[in-house]
Amino acid sequence: MTDTVVNRWMYPGDGPLQSNDKEQLQAGWSVHPGAQTDRQRKQEELTDEEKEIINRVIARAEKMEAMEQERIGRLVDRLETMRKNVAGDGVNRCILCGEQLGMLGSACVVCEDCKKNVCTKCGVETSNNRPHPVWLCKICLEQREVWKRSGAWFFKGFPKQVLPQPMPIKKTKPQQPAGEPATQEQPTPESRHPARAPARGDMEDRRPPGQKPGPDLTSAPGRGSHGPPTRRASEARMSTAARDSEGWDHAHGGGTGDTSRSPAGLRRANSVQAARPAPAPVPSPAPPQPVQPGPPGGSRATPGPGRFPEQSTEAPPSDPGYPGAVAPAREERTGPAGGFQAAPHTAAPYSQAAPARQPPPAEEEEEEANSYDSDEATTLGALEFSLLYDQDNSNLQCTIIRAKGLKPMDSNGLADPYVKLHLLPGASKSNKLRTKTLRNTRNPVWNETLQYHGITEEDMQRKTLRISVCDEDKFGHNEFIGETRFSLKKLKANQRKNFNICLERVIPMKRAGTTGSARGMALYEEEQVERIGDIEERGKILVSLMYSTQQGGLIVGIIRCVHLAAMDANGYSDPFVKLWLKPDMGKKAKHKTQIKKKTLNPEFNEEFFYDIKHSDLAKKSLDISVWDYDIGKSNDYIGGCQLGISAKGERLKHWYECLKNKDKKIERWHQLQNENHVSSD
């Protein structure tokens, strides 16, 4: 016994151990290389704990691949829906919208990829190194996006990789009465996907020469007892993306034509699939018989509407020993949508202690799958616009040029976008502007200029322009797509600045989490805004003054008002302006403008004449007040201002310049204030 132990443990130097050799003792011990050969180690069976760890790693990798398959399936499904909704022939009519092309119709361009004729609304001009412009239809543009987002451009040349099947775990179980078949009791950590079965050609390549199809009944219950190796999802994605995303099956509960392409519609489809119950486990027959290639009735899925209709997806045979025979209904969606071809083949069955299939994953796992899909959060689109501040006329011009790649909001994979502008702080209907709505497009071209009047240099220093892109819905609420914001103090006067910015989700305006001096400045700025809040809510008025020597009197022009306060319940006002030259000159001292219905930015362009000597004008003051007209009750006061010698600031300067420069019209913007006033009647 002692000799056996001594022979088994030898010193690394292959020499006998000497007790007085300290250097050899410091070198340590090692296992004799002849004690356990590689062949003996390979024949040893793995323990149940090791198999559990391996199965968990495989299941976790499969879960990530399944989520990736679903994400790519949604992208390709949206592309196929766009292909099904074509309305023209691509020759005389636009392939997308069906609009007439030619001399009597719209101008047409030829798609670079599909060589079909499209109108300029449905075509997108792409940048290229070629001297002539390159146009793509929206279908081909979407197909290129699918290639980029699915990784097909990368996996096209990616080498094949194989993940092993989970290993059966042997547990000591009580003996069952004779005649009762052994049931599958041990669940796997994660459900398996039948779409991972390899194609028939791959199986024949991996099968040794001379081996016939059928289960291997002589294999020992260990490493060789599990099923054949399967293909990775990346390999299948590569093969399908190389065929221009064709042959994908639309087995999302019957058809995808009625399913919305919005994220909410996708999540509803996922939850419906996850709610389906899993079929009960089927007892394993003994001994197992070879599986026939013919699929059972009702297992063949309908081929997708791609350009290769002959490519169909078959469900795996319903043999109890087949690894993917019992699977949740949710996997029916994952397999075909991922574009796999599960060709019928024979496989070595599991042993009688093979693990059973788990029920569908819980809602938390479904939410994880949705959160893993990051495309919906990053494809809001880009907006191209330009800004110009005309300092002389106190005018801010915002030209909305175009948007590209907007997020699809309608069931047809398109949107009805429009752009609206707000000035912050104090966003309201009074400072909201919007463009027209363009129908059924994700790449709208507006080329529309929106103007803000009465924007002073002070406004440019403390205001922010919010530009939002929304989708118009005739039968419901308009949906928000994305927005961007620009601080006007960064804009130089009389210099146009162009922007091409990616849209973002709603940006919070609260200054949360600021500390120290930054927090102090934030509170100071908010306090300043609150102090002038009453002034801003009243609005502004553009007034022109000119003393005419020919007519011998003062000509007052009321041009427009902007950003007036809303006085009616509908969020608007019915404004008019009243003039009163003080001290009282009788009835000829009072004038009124016309009433503008339901607006907060009225444009009057009216002039009024006061017959007065130039020497007497210095003793007078002009009271200007803006009112909201109401029927059956007293009018509401919005705001006013007073020009004259007793005024201050810009009002005094305006009055003084009028007296100094005869026969010269001088225009100034004035802030409306909640001053003391008399009745408008």
Curated annotation (Swiss-Prot):
UniProt binding sites for Ca(2+) 4: D568, D628, D630, D636
Residues the entry annotates as binding Zn(2+) 2: C111, C114, C137, C140
Cross-referenced SMART domains: C2
Zn finger residue spans: FYVE-type: 88-145
PTM-bearing positions, type Omega-N-methylarginine: R223
Entry binding sites for Ca(2+) 3: E526, D568, D574, D628, Y629, D630
Signal peptide: none
Biased composition (Pro residues): 278-296
Subunit structure comment from the entry: Interacts with RAB3B, RAB3C, RAB3D, RAB8A, RAB27A and RAB27B. Interacts with RAB3A; this interaction recruits RPH3A to synaptic vesicules. Interacts (via C2B domain) with SNAP25. Interacts with deubiquitinating enzyme CAND1; this interaction results in the deubiquitination of RPH3A. Interacts with GRIN2A and DLG4; this ternary complex regulates NMDA receptor composition at postsynaptic membranes. Interacts with SNCA.
Name this polypeptide is given: Rabphilin-3A
Source organism phylogeny: Eukaryota, Metazoa, Chordata, Craniata, Vertebrata
